[in-house]
Amino acid sequence: MDFTNRNTLRDCWIVNDNVMGGLSQSSLREDPQGMFFEGQISRENNGGFASMRSAIRFPQGTQHIELLANGDGKRYKLILRTELAPRVTYAADFVALPSWQTYQFNLGQFKSTFRGRAIDAPTLSFSDVIEIGILISDGQTGSFAIQLQTLQSK
């Protein structure tokens, strides 16, 4: 997935805590170096999260995922959803350092959750993934910004 390509931006969407009455805001912004996911997290009205998402398919045999990103020092989650368990979110934490970094994620790093709580779920396989996203939550408030350049399966 090439986040420097403007067509990628068109295929992404935002899901914030306003789906549950929260007041957090976020947006996606095009940039030649890569797409920005940025906004403001508020815990008012029981809120406290923002996410961007996109449909994706990984090839059979994918062993890990690599994300090239430039961040703000905050904690994010790379989230995956599958066709086998569409209501389950598989999440792997990372701190987005304020310089270009390649973050590598293998299957063992992803924990199954439902609305942020750990649950038992089918075993994750990258070949079952239909949606990917970046989530910021976990009690963090205030402004955030992460720039995404590429996401690759290896």
Regions picked out by a protein language model, each given a short descriptive name:
Residues 1-154:
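Beta-rich carbohydrate-recognition modules and glycan-binding surfaces
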